[in-house]
Each structure stands twice: as structure tokens, then as C-alpha cells.
Amino acid sequence: MEPNTVIPKYNVRGFEIWGFRDMAQVLDHLLGSGPVKTGTLVAMNAEKLLKAEDDTALCELIKNAEYLYADGISMVRAIRRKYPQAELSRVAGADLWEALMQRAGQQGTPVFLVGGKPDVLAETEAKLRAQWNVNLVGSQDGYFTPEQREALFARIAASGAAIVTVAMGSPKQEIFMRDCRKFYPDALYMGVGGTYDVFTSHVKRAPKIWQNMGLEWLYRLLAQPSRIRRQLKLLKFVGYYYSGRL
């Protein structure tokens, strides 16, 4: 990334979305030549935006995060409609996580993993070490009690992790990251949902051609028809789009 490059932010329904040009720009901004940036990364798509509008607590969590990025093609198109000169690309959360892990492996950046089933987490750790020699300084599956949270925060702090990725689903992962950051602010936190499952092939992701066409949502719907109710809720976002209320 060129020195002094200013990355624009775009307001969509009150949420400030970073306008990253491409994956390389994201990586250079977060893991450039200096220390890893600290803060919280939150993937934004139409579904999460609508959920946040109906949930005051989640809305506050998201708006307090430092890095909101356009994870869904719906968000990219909304920004381009509202800001015709915007030059940004979709940054899929699963792809960003893998790119961060690869760069972390190259730079020896310490990483702590949270969430997922025990077997999936173990497979994720093994694959990260084998594939990119990632410096994993600790992990915790998603099966811990509320009483164990502070001890986990202490473990993360003691590990010296510079990147903490949390796979617990929304809004649990946003709540966890907020609370852990109060205890240990010296890391980059990223909520990754079901990314560990995809990375270890327990869940199949849409083929690249579907992703490139912006139809990953349709692929998931065809594979899991029970998602239809969730998809129908997105009609509200379509209304925002065509009525100029973005």
C-alpha cells in the first residue's frame, strides 16, 4: 500500500463501512511493516445490518468496532449505488481470515483461536501449522461456561497473541470480542462465524464461479432450502436500495 493512502469509509444506514479496494489493501493496512493493528473486524452484509437494526445491543457492538468491511455483495452494491465513485471490492470473511493466517505465518505473528467444535478446532490448528506454519499460541473451543470467560481472557492476554479469531456466530462472537478487548486490548480481533468448518471442509462453500457472480447466497439457499425465511427478510434491504434510503 502506498504511503499515506487514505482508505475511505462509506455510511450505509448509519454504519461506517471501510472501502477496501482489494484483499491486498486490507492486509497491508492491518499487517503492514509495523505492528499489527489493534481493534475489531466485523463482516457486514445485508442480513447483519438488518439484524443490528432490530437489536439495539448488537447495533452498539457493531458500531463500536473499528473495522467494518463489506463481506456481502449486497453491501458492495449498496455502497456503489449511494456513492457512484466508490472503488471497493467485496472482502469475503472466509477469504480474509485465510489471507490473514497466511500473512501471519509468513511474519511469525502470534495467533489465538477461539470457538468451534473441539474436533474442528483441532483440525484447524493442525492445518494452519502444516499449510502456513502459523504461530498458534493458544486455542479454546466454543464449549466453555460463562464462569470460565475471565480465565479465558487471562489466557489470551498471557499468550501475547496479536491476532484473536472468534468463531461463535453473531452476536455471541461480537459480545465475546468486546468483553475480551476490555481485558486485553493489544490485539486484532476478528469474528469468523463458521469459517473453521469451511476451512476444514466440514461445510462446503459455494464454488468460485458462484462467488464471483455474487450468487453465494443463492447457492446456500439451494443447498439449504430452510434458509428461505432468512432470505425473505432481506426484502427490507432491497426496499432500502430502491427507495434511496441507504
Swiss-Prot record:
Pathway named in the protein's UniProt entry: Bacterial outer membrane biogenesis; enterobacterial common antigen biosynthesis
GO process annotations (BP): enterobacterial common antigen biosynthetic process
Q: What is its EC number?
A: 2.4.1.180
Coiled-coil segments on the chain, per record: none
Q: Which reaction does it catalyse?
A: UDP-N-acetyl-alpha-D-mannosaminouronate + N-acetyl-alpha-D-glucosaminyl-di-trans,octa-cis-undecaprenyl diphosphate = beta-D-ManNAcA-(1->4)-alpha-D-GlcNAc-di-trans,octa-cis-undecaprenyl diphosphate + UDP + H(+)
* Superkingdom of the source species: Bacteria
Q: Which UniProt keywords apply?
A: Glycosyltransferase, Transferase
Top-tier EC class:
transferase
Q: Is the keyword Transferase assigned to this protein?
A: yes
**Entries under InterPro entries matching the protein:** UDP-ManNAcA_Trfase_WecG, WecG_TagA_CpsF
Family annotation (NCBIfam families): PRK03692.1 (NF002980), wecG_tagA_cpsF (TIGR00696)
Q: What does the record give as the function of this protein?
A: Catalyzes the synthesis of Und-PP-GlcNAc-ManNAcA (Lipid II), the second lipid-linked intermediate involved in enterobacterial common antigen (ECA) synthesis.
The family assignment reads:
Belongs to the glycosyltransferase 26 family.
Q: Could you identify this protein by its name?
A: UDP-N-acetyl-D-mannosaminuronic acid transferase
Species of provenance: Yersinia pestis
Taxonomic lineage of this organism?
Bacteria, Pseudomonadati, Pseudomonadota, Gammaproteobacteria, Enterobacterales
GN (gene name): wecG
